[in-house]
Amino acid sequence: MGRLLLWVGLVLLMKPNDGTAYKLVCYFTNWAHSRPVPASILPRDLDPFLCTHLIFAFASMSNNQIVANNLQDEKILYPEFNKLKERNRALKTLLSVGGWNFGTSRFTTMLSTLASREKFIGSVVSFLRTHGFDGLDLFFLYPGLRGSPINDRWNFLFLIEELQFAFEKEALLTQRPRLLLSAAVSGIPYIIQTSYDVHLLGRRLDFINVLSYDLHGSWEKSTGHNSPLFSLPEDPKSSAFAMNYWRNLGAPADKLLMGFPAYGRTFHLLRESKNGLQAASMGPASPGKYTKQAGFLAYYEVCSFIQRAEKHWIDHQYVPYAYKGKEWVGYDDAVSFSYKAMFVKKEHFGGAMVWTLDMDDVRGTFCGNGPFPLVHILNELLVRAEFNSTPLPQFWFTLPVNSSGPGSESLPVTEELTTDTVKILPPGGEAMATEVHRKYEKVTTIPNGGFVTPAGTTSPTTHAVALERNAMAPGAKTTTSLDLLSETMTGMTVTVQTQTAGRETMTTVGNQSVTPGGETMTTVGNQSVTPGGETVTTVGNQSVTPGGETMTTVGNQSVTPGGETVTIVGNKSVTPVGETVTIVGNKSVTPGGQTTATVGSQSVTPPGMDTTLVYLQTMTLSEKGTSSKKAVVLEKVTVPPREISVMPNEQNTALNRENLIAEVESYSQDG
């Protein structure tokens, strides 16, 4: 206890008084009151001065309209919740709709047409104003997954834009402050890529609650922390990784709120003697006394558990865990929350989101540190501004505690980067630097399982760390990918632009040029690419000449290389004979025999690797029997517009299937 108070005091002295208005958004659940006493919590038990925004979870949906989950919520909990604003006039309250148990089917039905979305939006404006809420939070887990069709990814965007438009219109007509709009989103990369257009979400929402927790749990076969701040070499999932992933995909940093869980995830150990991080486990530990959910302990239940448990600190992840017998819990405490809050400030994110306020030690009954010990430290570090600042140490993530972590001692290999060349580091780290790294002084490479710990540093230096990962790709080839570990850096984070496949090396120069090992591909402008041994030249924007062949564009529809016919449908899909060419927007092209897929300007996939691209329009031209006619097979028609109009026309939300098929049939007849 003494160590904690001393440490927190030092953190408060270091807290920068930078004048930045951080958000501290706290969820409150409508089932918190149903827990046994003394864990039963009502809105009246909350401190209205701790959080800048309170979100009531959850409302429901019926017949494409927002509704209360039950009569008690509407008649008792809503009024109590919004009455907190009488004590703190600056407090904002929002109502969240959805949640994990809500599923996806009602969202899908509501999103499916413009008419059903308009019905929902009309009910939302009326419902929020009637009950005194200041905004809506969308908790849709997840568009395009868990039974939700992939079209929901784009219909969800339409809903958000239409909600924003309706909120602005209502504010103008009533002369009241505009209703706020937020969303809870995943922190897992494959879900982010599938479910969201990050750039457009970032433009439309007032703030984004990143669920940077539930990264590990009893559904896995070994122990892992629920919400580590930083990644381990063999496991990139972490709060920092999730936040940087969203930022690097185009979300404004000041709208991104990092998720802080006021709970832990538990495991049942396979062997009592193997009790560290990544120890073998078999399902969840026993349910908590009050939450009664296997694999889960609220923070106040964690406090009771650790009184008789062995506690440890995870180096490089800045979070604690504890075990007792065969029961293991990875949790957060005031110290780990402090590290995470300082990370939010250091990286200039928008603030913190807490799930949930009612799982903190609300009355100070369990943990002995007063009421709301977790949220209180976030309030001190992010909201209050009366503490003077002193400079932070250059590497402040170095608190010595009882620590543990996999891997060996640090084995750094450093190469200087020049300012005018792309530097490929020597074998040993199998790492490479791309143009995006040139803003940094050094790139450090380490072997798998190693850590980088800056030592003896007395003056500011900036490092980026590249880590080798191996995975099996199609065709029994080994794929080596390189990840940049943002947790070891002191400056802005960057994303990986370059990967190696098999024995080849690919170097990305900006977003334009790719070099696979043994071949050189050069982009001329934005339209022309030169693979090794061939030259492809763009004449204007319409005509392409590969080495030895001539390709002529007739209008915008057809291109004829020597002896073959290529058809362009709109601006989206190009189909040469026997090959499939897929264009996502203007970014992704698949030449025959190889796949080069660029998603936005973030990732490059060399030959031999699987690439999952959503919302593609793919067409294949093939010979049919002995006839010389060419049949076109339509595989998918799901390319949405990159930009969404203020009032999108329902006819423009997807390609017109009938017209496209008619064009295809006409082409087949012309042969």
From Swiss-Prot:
Residues 1-21 form the signal peptide. Binds to oocyte zona pellucida in vivo. May play a role in the fertilization process and/or early embryonic development. Might act as a protective secretion influencing the first steps of the reproductive process necessary for the normal triggering of fertilization and early embryonic development. Residues 22-385 form the GH18 domain. Belongs to the glycosyl hydrolase 18 family. Disulfide bonds join C26-C51. CDD domains: GH18_chitolectin_chitotriosidase. This is Oviduct-specific glycoprotein. One of its GO terms (molecular function) is chitinase activity. Glycans are attached at N402, N511, N526, N541, N556, N571, N586. Chitin binds at L71, Q72, G98, G99, W100, N101, Y142, L211, S212, Y213, D214, W355. The gene is OVGP1. GO terms for biological process: carbohydrate metabolic process; chitin catabolic process; single fertilization. Highly O-glycosylated and also N-glycosylated. Keywords: Cytoplasmic vesicle, Disulfide bond, Fertilization, Glycoprotein, Repeat, Signal. It is found in: Cytoplasmic vesicle, Secretory vesicle. GO terms for cellular component: extracellular region; transport vesicle. Oviduct. It comes from the Eukaryota. It comes from Mesocricetus auratus. Residues 490-609 are annotated as: 8 X 15 AA tandem repeats. PANTHER family: CHITINASE, OVIDUCT-SPECIFIC GLYCOPROTEIN. Sequence repeats lie at residues 490-504, 505-519, 520-534, 535-549, 550-564, 565-579, 580-594, 595-609.
